[in-house]
Regions:
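Gly/Ser-rich helix-loop-strand patches that form or flank binding pockets
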Residues: 1-23, 45-51, 56, 152-214, ...
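Small/aliphatic-rich secondary-structure junction motif
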Residues: 11-14, 21-95, 106, 110, ...
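Short, well-ordered alpha-helical microsegments
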Residues: 45, 159, 228, 290-291
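Generic structural signal for helix capping and beta-alpha/helix-loop junctions
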Residues: 73, 126, 183, 216, ...
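Charged docking surfaces used in two-component/phosphorelay signaling
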Residues: 120-136, 140-161, 285-290
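Conserved beta-strand segments of alpha/beta enzyme cores
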Residues: 147-149, 205, 278-281, 332
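A short, acidic, amphipathic alpha-helical segment used as a generic capping/interface helix at domain edges
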Residues: 268-270, 286-297
Length: 337
């Protein structure tokens, strides 16, 4: 019996083959634009899927929709039904928690012009956390090689499940729904909500999606730094691909700083001109940056801010303009990394 639980040891040759397979898979994924859209089952959260569908508008974009459920959820008594359901997650009569929400995703994607239900599909399952259901995904692949994945993931909590999913990626963009609560930096250091935790810790850019799809335009903020200019470039490409007008904005804290703000937007406009991306408008303002960005940018579909790359402790000590905008904005906010 002791031998039954003994860990399987791979030979050096087998380990090398596994590493090479993973490296090839990651290299292949890096050549594509991959979006991870997270849902929690509420009607409001499906806005993440609509945003993802509109951003993933070409065949070199892949879309993964994730639903994270807590461990177990009382499924221990239904082992046989669970095994049958996970083998054919989208068609089984017995529904795992979250499956109905993933079925709704297919309907929303069809409404957005992506009819993946008729594509060839592959179902995969992995054991996780000793849970009867584990992790299950259904991948739909178009003839052009485009991938739509519906993933049901088991995790101790939603935030850790989402961040763990990134490690299985990588992803270029995560899309989360509007937070139900957002704590100050001090309280968040000890107890942050799901969206706040993921936004703070995610290695890639994060869009916090609010009900702003009916609005138009990307309100892209810059302070003139090289990090900010990289964010301008990335956000502008996304805006250009989705045919959204671009407004460049910079805020100065004093009148003396206004020339620097004007120079920042002028340099950003020149950068985009070199990329053959048109800028609809440039704007500057004097005041507290967060207040100016939130007040002026909330009329647009998306506010774009540059993440400062600060740790939780650094955010506690120094604060974060990007985090404050995400928290206070009345529209969707793209935090670019």
């Amino acid at each position: 019996m002791a031998g039954f639980f003994r860990r399987t040891i791979l030979s050096d040759r087998q380990e090398a083959a596994v590493r090479k397979t993973l490296q090839n898979l990651r290299a292949q994924r890096r050549s594509r634009f991959r979006i991870l859209a997270c849902i929690d089952g509420t009607d409001e959260a499906f806005v993440t899927v609509r945003f993802a569908a509109r951003f993933a508008c070409t065949d070199d974009c892949d879309l993964i929709v994730l639903y994270v459920r807590p461990i177990d959820q009382g499924l221990n008594s239904g082992g046989l039904q669970v095994r049958l359901a996970r083998q054919n997650m989208m068609d089984a009569g017995f529904e795992l928690p979250g499956v109905s929400h993933l079925k709704r995703v297919l309907e929303i994607l069809k409404e957005e012009g992506i009819d993946a239900a008729g594509w060839p599909k592959l179902t995969e399952h992995q054991d996780a956390w000793g849970d009867p259901a584990g992790d299950t995904k259904v991948e739909y692949r178009s003839p052009a090689g485009r991938s739509i994945v519906l993933k049901l993931k088991t995790a101790p909590d939603a935030a850790s499940g989402i961040l763990d999913q990134y490690e299985l990626g990588p992803y270029n963009l995560m899309i989360l729904g509007e937070p139900s609560r957002w704590r100050g930096e001090f309280n968040a250091f000890f107890d942050a909500g799901i969206v706040q935790s993921v936004t703070t810790m995610a290695p890639c850019s994060v869009l916090v999606a609010r009900q702003s799809l009916a609005r138009q335009g990307f309100f892209i903020c810059t302070d003139g730094t090289s990090r900010s200019m990289q964010a301008v470039r990335r956000a502008a490409v996304l805006a250009h691909m989705t045919q959204e007008p671009i407004t460049l904005f910079s805020a100065a804290t004093t009148e003396q700083g206004k020339p620097a703000a004007e120079e920042a937007v002028a340099n950003a406009k020149a950068l985009l001109k070199a990329m053959k991306i048109e800028v609809a408008e440039t704007r500057t303002a004097v005041g507290k940056p967060v207040e100016e960005i939130v007040e002026r940018g909330s009329l647009y579909k998306v506010i774009v801010v540059t993440d400062e790359g600060r740790s939780r402790l650094q955010r506690l000590l120094k604060g974060s303009t990007a985090t404050d905008v995400v928290r206070r904005a009345r529209t969707s906010v793209l935090d670019v990394r």
